[in-house]
Amino acid sequence: MKKGKRIVNSWNEWDPLKHVIVGRADGTCIPAPEPALDAKVPEDSDMRGKFGPRTKDTVDKANQLLDDFSNILVKRGIKVDRPTPLNFNQKTSTPDWESETMFGCMPPRDVLLTVGNEILEATMSYRCRWFEYLCYRPLLKEYYDLDPNMRHESAPKPRLTDADYRKDYLSDKIGIQKRLKWTEDKFFVTTEEEPLFDAADVLRFGKDLVVQHGFTTNLKGIDWLKRHYKNHRVHAVNFPGDPYPIHIDATFTPIKEGLIINNPQRRLPKEQRKLFENNGWEIIDAAQPAHNEPPPLCYSSVWLSMNVLVLDPKTVCVEKSETYQAEQLDKLGMEVIPVELRDAYAFGGGLHCCTADVYREGELKDYFPKQ
């Protein structure tokens, strides 16, 4: 890369993608139990009580899929960078807590939020992910050194003491109906002790940022984002049908200007739809997933089917086995690129999760002037 060049620029989820970070599966661990994580792991999950490194064969398979995905992007003229994995199978600590393991660096979308010429490191809300930003520092340093306009920012690191989490969430006896009621009432595992947010709870629509209030992002985190992005309008949204609301990109996915697919089990509430509808945007139900269950040892739901990566307003990457989602996007006029990734889902998510924007063509626009 040449010094003085504009390297970092991305204002939305659909402008032509030219430079991206794709995660790695090396050394990924199933994290040890901790307050935020216990609430996220479904009560009947085969991950309850397990922690430590994932098996070499599953890591190798996931890495092969991530490498293949990277090669698909490179062949389409997109520059791909990769993170530097840490030894995730080691104990970490701060003066407030200890964690038996870390997590991994397969999903950079969770950690890095690119808005214009700035890349922001999110606070994160899991103790096991507190040090994950280090995997991306070599890349961010390179961008900063070469791009005179690049801003590298980091949100205040949270203490993540027990005061950040509700103990009520830890019981195995809580049924799905009670969880859904809690979600409807916006009663989540995280308290309002300090600002918390994951980057994957934020969607970028030019001058507007749409942020999910849920397990991994609290209202103080959303307020911090409002203060930080002074030239943007920041909107809090929530999805009452999701008993485990974490990250917005398997629930609400912009495909191109004017069009969003929404998880039919987690519809955006009527009042919150006005921002989009008043400005001529269409919100349609996403197609059903092709699978009835997520892969083994996976945190995510079957709705990773809609966790797609838009390469430009006419082109989208969809997981190869998700035939219904591919068919829907094809009918909507998109060129669909099938990408095999299902065997890497357990390492941190789908095609959107495992990437983070560095550069998309385009400038800052106002897509919602009527507010």
Where are the language model's segments positioned?
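The feature marks the mature, well-folded catalytic cores of soluble enzymes
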Residues: 1-371
